[in-house]
C-alpha cells in the first residue's frame, strides 16, 4: 500500500530580498510566517514528505520566478520540491528543475495555454508537471440549473466547482472536474487541488471537491485548503483516495508538528512514512 504524503506549503512573497512566507484566509488577510529557506529546512528535519513552494505574486505581477530561492533551499533540503508561480513556458520548467526543484506547478498559464502541459511533459516528463486547480463552490438549486457543469450534491446543497486564476483574483467559469480530466489528457502528472472556500480557514478539507476530482482522474491528487488539525487530515484520507494532504497554517504557527500529524494518522491505520 502506498504511503500517504504530508506536504507543508510555503506561499512566498518575494518582494523582500530573502523572501517571506505568508498565509491568508480564503486568499486574503495575509499574515507573515517566516523565511522560506529556514521554514523548508525545518519541515524537512521534521519529516515532511515533500514541500510545495508557491510564488504568490509572480503570476499576477509578472515577475521572475524564484530559482535563486530554490537554489539556496536545496542545499539543505533533500526531499521532493514542487515550485509554482510564474511558470508560463517550458523554459520556466527547465530553469526550476536545474535550480533543484523536482516538479513545477502551474495554474493560470495552463488555463490560458493548455498545450503548455503537453509541451512540458515531453521535455521534463509528466512526473514533473503539476497543475494547480484553485476551485470555488458555485451553488445551484438543482442540477438542471447548470446543465453544462458537473454538479455535485454536498451537505450544503448542490454545487459545481469554478476554476480561478491569478491567485484567486479572477474566475474563469470553467468546471474544475472537467478541467482536471483535460489536464490528465494533456500530460499532467499530478493535481494540486485547493479549495478556495477552505483556504486558511482551518475548518477541514472540502471532501466533496477532493472526492469528485480524485474519482474522475487516475493521476495523484494533493488535497489543499482547510487543514486545521490532524483529524481534518485523517478525514480527507478516510473519505477520499487523495494521495497527499497539504497544509500551511497549522505548521507555520506551531499548532502541530508534522510528526504529530503522522503519529496520529498511523494510530488510525493510515500508512505514512515515519
From Swiss-Prot:
GO terms for molecular function: imidazoleglycerol-phosphate synthase activity; lyase activity. Its main location: cytoplasm. Coiled coil: none annotated. It catalyses: 5-[(5-phospho-1-deoxy-D-ribulos-1-ylimino)methylamino]-1-(5-phospho-beta-D-ribosyl)imidazole-4-carboxamide + L-glutamine = D-erythro-1-(imidazol-4-yl)glycerol 3-phosphate + 5-amino-1-(5-phospho-beta-D-ribosyl)imidazole-4-carboxamide + L-glutamate + H(+). One of its GO terms (cellular component) is cytoplasm. It is found in: Cytoplasm. InterPro entries: Aldolase_TIM, His_biosynth, HisF, IGPS_HisA/HisF, RibuloseP-bd_barrel. Its EC number is 4.3.2.10. Pathway: Amino-acid biosynthesis; L-histidine biosynthesis; L-histidine from 5-phospho-alpha-D-ribose 1-diphosphate: step 5/9. Pfam families: His_biosynth. Keywords: Amino-acid biosynthesis, Cytoplasm, Histidine biosynthesis, Lyase. It is an enzyme of class 4 (lyase). The active site is at 11, 134. IGPS catalyzes the conversion of PRFAR and glutamine to IGP, AICAR and glutamate. The HisF subunit catalyzes the cyclization activity that produces IGP and AICAR from PRFAR using the ammonia provided by the HisH subunit. Heterodimer of HisH and HisF. HAMAP family: HisF (MF_01013). Belongs to the HisA/HisF family. NCBIfam families: hisF. This is Imidazole glycerol phosphate synthase subunit HisF. It comes from Methanobrevibacter smithii (strain ATCC 35061 / DSM 861 / OCM 144 / PS). The gene is hisF.
